[in-house]
Amino acid sequence: MNIGDKAPEILGHDENGNEIRLSDFKGRKLVLYFYPKDLTSGCTTEACNLRDNYTKLKELGYEVIGASVDDGKQHLKFIAKNELPFHLIADTEKTLVEQFGVWGEKKMYGRTYMGTFRTTF
């Protein structure tokens, strides 16, 4: 996804299985952030930062949606544990991460694997 590209209308399904569409946010600003994995330290820090600033973001007219390749059940645990006030897209088939270009080869501790690049739009 590049600046100026049109985002897909159907973003995916949230932690409860509800479809999330881009048109749901018409007239509002949307922060869509991608993260690698629920319940990990870096992703928890990022989600909690957005949680802690959520009221301010809402006052400025923003909505926040997170997305990872974790399933809805895992998202529900992550939301409950960290009291997240926003929805998380369960992109288990990797459709959205591929459309936005945030899925690819990563390296950690000398190991190469496929994963989500931490990215915010």
Feature locations, PLM:
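Chalcogenol-based redox active-site neighborhoods
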Residues: 1-121
